[in-house]
Amino acid sequence: MGKEKTHINLVVIGHVDAGKSTTTGHLIYKLGGIDARTIAKFEADAKEMGKSSFKYAWVLDKLKAERERGITIDIALWKFSTAKFEYTVIDAPGHRDFIKNMITGTSQADVALLVIDGNNFEAGIAEGGSTKEHALLAYTLGVKQLAVGINKMDDVKDKDGGPWAQGRYNEVVDYLGPELMKIGFKKKDKGDKKKGDKKEKKDKKDKGEKKYVCSATFVPISGWTGDNMLEKSTNMPWYTGPTLFEVLDAMKPPKRPTEDPLRLPLQDVYKIGGIGTVPVGRVETGILKAGMQVTFEPAGKAAVEVKSVEMHHTSVPQAIPGDNVGFNVKLTVKDIKRGDVCGDTKNDPPIPTECFLANVIIQDHKNIRNGYTPVLDCHTAHIACKFASILSKKDKRGKQTHDVSDDTEWATKDDAEPRNNRMNIAAKTGESVNVWLQPTKAMVVEAYSMYSPLGRFAVRDMKKTVAVGVIQCVQPRNMAKGATEELPIRGESDAVSKYIKFRPLPLKAGKKAKK
């Protein structure tokens, strides 16, 4: 028996109509993930509906509504293998109306493929476009390795009117590279002088010298014809870099926190005939095994036995971080739902959150103040959370401009009651704040230092991402009936002792999640 390949989850993101599903479907087909007969059937069905170019996209677009509209609404899972890895593909929607599903898919990914329409690149970066927002969300949700497929190269035009144009490819790369670096997709430029080099400080005036380069790998492709997907394209001899397949095979295997307690955010819950209730999701930390006792929060279900664990319709003895699995439990489909978190009942089980302290960077908003209540997307949860108490603010240059602890009148008080935040700090695009956030419905989040996949989030409002954040510490909710005692704060942060007195007043003790 050969060594089992490492599992990697790949999310395919990008603006609507960039060709994500076609590119992914063609790649899966080329790698033997689907047979020619099925592709021929898809082609016949597509022609009948007047959409003959959709045959590869339909490998993933399984819902009838998606086929008729020609856009991906749900997230679809498929798999293929490279020399080193076993890939699970998550094809995420590009349409703005379905960004919630895109976030759910991206929260489960290790690496991302950003598909760009080389022929109509401007639509994805214009106001209302999804290209940069998808890249930002991917990075915020923990995806640090990115491949960029400049798609539809068979259809682009250069100045002379021919397809496969190098000029257009360069134009897209020159614009997108710096934008991705601003988001965080960057690495040290190997061409820079190393620390300690005698020539390092030779020219102090040249402060514009690049010290970082974009860490994303760009590949010109055609999802329709298959150029540069597995084999080098004869249509683009000017491109000497790796194929898309080679880029995916060169990804670094993600670190898997198997030693940590179990955390598995639920993506969906199904009722399967002859089996029963099957929650599905990605193991973020720890190990899930058949026979273990698990807890679901904020559903309030504890000591539930895991009957069996399946991955890609095959029974497995256990699932480790990164695995997308379904597992059978003796509950009804109404007992648990998407956004609930599964953990080991006997080892630090998840606890619903009363409020949490976070550092939030404002991406696109003119005036955020106390009381603002947008939707937060954290792991698979999609819950409105109130900016209960903005505590401090830094400007675009990182200089601190406001801090509630500077209120000298409060500084002299030592009462134990939560204190009112009287500063009413306002924040706008480019600024960052420390803030106590309070969910309007029961949810589970964790401090980034303890469970990083459950400790980062995106803030969405008006159909766009307005901010991203990292959770510093969490005040768990005491779910015991009639409880008055506060549970210990989870997570460590220098800001905790400074700002703990400004926590929002707790919700009613023992309050269950709203269904």
From Swiss-Prot:
Keyword Cell division part of the UniProt annotation: no
Subcellular location: Cytoplasm
Region (G2): 70-74
Pfam family, one: GTP_EFTU
Residue span of region G3: 91-94
Keyword terms: Cytoplasm, Elongation factor, GTP-binding, Methylation, Nucleotide-binding, Protein biosynthesis
Ranges for region G5: 222-224
Gene3D superfamilies attached to this UniProt entry: P-loop containing nucleotide triphosphate hydrolases (3.40.50.300), Translation factors (2.40.30.10)
UniProt xrefs under InterPro entries: EFTu-like_2, G_TR_CS, GTP-eEF1A_C, P-loop_NTPase, T_Tr_GTP-bd_dom, TRAFAC_GTPase_members, Transl_B-barrel_sf, Transl_elong_EF1A/Init_IF2_C
Superkingdom of source: Eukaryota
Region (G1): 14-21
GO cellular component, one term: cytoplasm
Chain positions with N6,N6,N6-trimethyllysine modification: K79, K334, K441
Binding site for GTP: 14-21, 91-95, 151-154
Keyword presence, Ribonucleoprotein: no
PTM-bearing positions, type N6,N6-dimethyllysine: K55
Location of region: G4: 151-154
Region (Disordered): 187-206, 396-419
Annotated CDD domains: EF1_alpha, EF1_alpha_II
Residues found modified as N6-methyllysine: K289
Function recorded in the entry: This protein promotes the GTP-dependent binding of aminoacyl-tRNA to the A-site of ribosomes during protein biosynthesis.
Family the UniProt entry places it in: Belongs to the TRAFAC class translation factor GTPase superfamily. Classic translation factor GTPase family. EF-Tu/EF-1A subfamily.
The protein's name: Elongation factor 1-alpha S
Organism: Porphyra purpurea (Red seaweed)
